[in-house]
Amino acid sequence: MTTRYLLDKSAAYRAHLPAVRHRLEPLMERGLLARCGITDLEFGVSARSREDHRTLGTYRRDALEYVNTPDTVWVRAWEIQEALTDKGFHRSVKIPDLIIAAVAEHHGIPVMHYDQDFERIAAITRQPVEWVVAPGTA
């Protein structure tokens, strides 16, 4: 079985770096990278103009499979956040990352990331997450 990943912006934004590009390009070529609603919004923030926003949207729609965000994801994100309070991490983990992790967990796919938040979440959920490259190298 081939693993498909939910691509977080923390990994995608580093695609200009050779090691990250080397990791992501084969996955993209094989259609193994996915997006969800919240990742689309995160990418939209980086647009410098309306035209750039449209270009980013078209690129993401063409390049990445879309996985939906069912209503149960919001409940699960709340549960994860609540569990993070026990470790004192509920304020340090970004809300979009909670949602992305819950979407990935719902669909049974790992998050491809470059963000410690997903490691903190996975310590609670035991879901698979993967650094796009080793931490500290990008």
From Swiss-Prot:
<feature type="binding site">
    <location>
        <position position="97"/>
    </location>
    <ligand>
        <name>Mg(2+)</name>
    </ligand>
</feature>
<dbReference type="GO" id="GO:0004521">
    <property type="term" value="F:RNA endonuclease activity"/>
</dbReference>
<keyword id="KW-0378">Hydrolase</keyword>
<feature type="domain" description="PINc">
    <location>
        <begin position="6"/>
        <end position="128"/>
    </location>
</feature>
<dbReference type="InterPro" id="IPR002716">
    <property type="entry name" value="PIN_dom"/>
</dbReference>
<dbReference type="GO" id="GO:0000287">
    <property type="term" value="F:magnesium ion binding"/>
</dbReference>
<dbReference type="Pfam" id="PF01850">
    <property type="entry name" value="PIN"/>
</dbReference>
<keyword id="KW-0460">Magnesium</keyword>
<dbReference type="GO" id="GO:0045926">
    <property type="term" value="P:negative regulation of growth"/>
</dbReference>
<comment type="similarity">
    <text>Belongs to the PINc/VapC protein family.</text>
</comment>
<keyword id="KW-0540">Nuclease</keyword>
<protein>
    <recommendedName>
        <fullName>Ribonuclease VapC21</fullName>
        <ecNumber>3.1.-.-</ecNumber>
    </recommendedName>
</protein>
<dbReference type="InterPro" id="IPR022907">
    <property type="entry name" value="VapC_family"/>
</dbReference>
<keyword id="KW-0479">Metal-binding</keyword>
<dbReference type="InterPro" id="IPR050556">
    <property type="entry name" value="Type_II_TA_system_RNase"/>
</dbReference>
<feature type="binding site">
    <location>
        <position position="8"/>
    </location>
    <ligand>
        <name>Mg(2+)</name>
    </ligand>
</feature>
<keyword id="KW-1277">Toxin-antitoxin system</keyword>
<dbReference type="InterPro" id="IPR029060">
    <property type="entry name" value="PIN-like_dom_sf"/>
</dbReference>
<comment type="function">
    <text>Toxic component of a type II toxin-antitoxin (TA) system. An RNase. Upon expression in M.smegmatis inhibits colony formation. Its toxic effect is neutralized by coexpression with cognate antitoxin VapB21.</text>
</comment>
